[in-house]
């Protein structure tokens, strides 16, 4: 077990505290925008976004009329989101979480692995969007995360899962995730369809130093089950 598996929460809290958040995007994720139309959206749609940070993807969902429920460990990230986007909110204290509640958006400050404890407090959701949660977790924690999400997601939940695949195992996030791993961790209940794969043009120097020569952005979809 590596250091991140034993102290994953502190790793992410430190990165937010030190503003080491180069993963934050200035525009909605290109694969979310490209494949959003594949989701079955209606007036009551609610999207769960684990480890949401201050992602602008949340604004994209809101702009499409989809309510958002986020889970985020770093309170600094949550405050940044509401401040940067001038969204009014109220704060509600609960057991195992602190809730920042705005119009059509709720973000729970909590350890993602406390999700089963607070699941009954969440609005009913029909979409799970995962851009940065699964690939942020080391291998053992990804297995536990998948098991937990299967427990809290309704059977007909639509899932849009964005991951990365590398040609060399990485020691820091974002981690490489293969289709074989997803089948192993989710196949009991979830059947993912690979809908996109794009090779990254410019691999960061620190990845090249690890011996990495190829990276791919891969997108998986699990449609609503009827």
From Swiss-Prot:
GO MF terms on file?
thiopurine S-methyltransferase activity
Biological-process GO terms, alphabetical? methylation
Task: For this UniProt record, give its keywords in alphabetical order, as a comma-separated list.
Answer: Cytoplasm, Methyltransferase, S-adenosyl-L-methionine, Transferase
SUPFAM superfamilies attached to this UniProt entry: S-adenosyl-L-methionine-dependent methyltransferases
Q: What InterPro entries does the database record attribute to this sequence?
A: SAM-dependent_MTases_sf (IPR029063), Thiopurine_S-MeTrfase (IPR025835), TPMT (IPR008854)
* Compartments where found: Cytoplasm
Q: What class of enzyme is it?
A: transferase
Q: What is its main location?
A: cytoplasm
Q: What is its EC number?
A: 2.1.1.67
Q: This protein's superkingdom?
A: Bacteria
Signal sequence range: none
Quote the Pfam families the UniProt record gives.
TPMT
Q: Where does S-adenosyl-L-methionine bind?
A: 16, 51, 72, 131
Q: Which reaction does it catalyse?
A: S-adenosyl-L-methionine + a thiopurine = S-adenosyl-L-homocysteine + a thiopurine S-methylether
Task: Give the family per the record.
Answer: Belongs to the class I-like SAM-binding methyltransferase superfamily. TPMT family.
List the HAMAP family.
Answer: Thiopur_methtran (MF_00812)
Tell me what this protein is called. Answer: Thiopurine S-methyltransferase
**From which source organism is this entry?**
Francisella tularensis subsp. novicida (strain U112)
């Amino acid at each position: 077990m590596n250091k991140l598996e034993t102290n994953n929460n502190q790793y992410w809290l430190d990165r937010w505290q030190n503003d080491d958040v180069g993963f934050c995007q200035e525009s909605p994720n290109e694969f979310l925008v490209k494949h959003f139309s594949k989701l079955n959206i209606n007036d009551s749609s609610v999207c769960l976004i684990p480890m949401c940070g201050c992602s602008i993807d949340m604004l994209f969902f809101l702009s499409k009329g989809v309510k958002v429920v986020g889970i985020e460990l770093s309170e600094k990230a949550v405050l940044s989101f509401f401040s940067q986007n001038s969204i009014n909110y109220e704060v509600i204290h609960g057991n195992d979480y602190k809730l920042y509640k705005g119009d059509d958006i709720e973000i729970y400050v909590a350890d993602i692995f406390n999700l089963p404890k607070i699941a009954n407090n969440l609005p009913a959701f029909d979409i799970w969007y995962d851009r940065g949660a699964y690939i942020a977790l080391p291998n053992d924690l990804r297995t536990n995360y998948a098991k937990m999400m299967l427990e809290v997601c309704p059977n007909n939940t639509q899932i849009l899962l964005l991951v990365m695949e590398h040609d060399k195992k990485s020691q820091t996030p974002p981690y490489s995730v293969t289709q074989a791993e997803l089948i192993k961790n989710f196949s009991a209940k979830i059947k993912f369809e690979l809908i996109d794969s794009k090779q990254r043009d410019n691999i960061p120097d620190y990845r090249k130093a690890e011996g990495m020569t190829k990276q791919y952005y891969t997108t998986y979809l699990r449609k609503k089950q009827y």
